């Protein structure tokens, strides 16, 4: 949330040399345009929100394809967003098969693809994107440590599995 206040840009003094004394520089970010997001099956709500929140803050419309096995978190997030003051058409949550997601990569109207998942799939998607900007988060390793003196290993395993696939 804190980073969203810096999206519009900043004004900086350019006093790094005597020649620049009294000069200021300004940079401004502008929305990239419509974005496409493909989120993974693990941490389905959290990793979807990591894509959606910056797009909303920057004013970029988006389409989100949640993982086929865990779409509920993204669907519920879409229902919540539908009750906000976001403009109609600002977002779409589109659960679909991998084959049905080709437009997420090849449609030139979508200016950015953000994908979280396996390296093989990610690099394949990037190769199909043409001039579109691509953000890849590949091959995560969310390690879990279980102490050797854990009293109930079956309970620990059950909680780890629940936490991994929680919706």
Task: Go through the PLM ranges and name each one.
Residues 1, 74-77, 104, 125:
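Hydrophobic packing residues within well-ordered alpha-helices of enzyme cores
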């Amino acid at each position: 949330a804190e980073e969203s206040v810096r999206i519009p840009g900043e004004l900086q003094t350019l006093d790094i040399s005597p020649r620049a004394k009294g000069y200021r520089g300004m940079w401004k970010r502008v929305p990239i345009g419509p974005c496409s997001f493909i989120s993974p099956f693990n941490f389905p709500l959290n990793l979807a929100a990591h894509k959606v929140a910056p797009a909303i803050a920057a004013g970029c419309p988006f389409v989100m394809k949640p993982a086929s096995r865990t779409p509920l978190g993204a669907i519920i997030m879409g229902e919540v967003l539908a009750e906000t003051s976001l403009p109609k058409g600002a977002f779409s949550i589109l659960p679909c098969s991998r084959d049905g997601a080709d437009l997420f990569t090849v449609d030139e109207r979508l200016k950015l693809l953000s994908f979280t998942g396996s390296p093989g799939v990610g690099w394949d998607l990037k190769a199909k994107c043409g001039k579109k900007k691509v953000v890849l988060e590949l091959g995560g390793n969310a390690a879990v440590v279980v102490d050797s003196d854990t009293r109930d290993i079956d309970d620990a395993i059950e909680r780890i599995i629940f936490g991994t696939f929680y919706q």
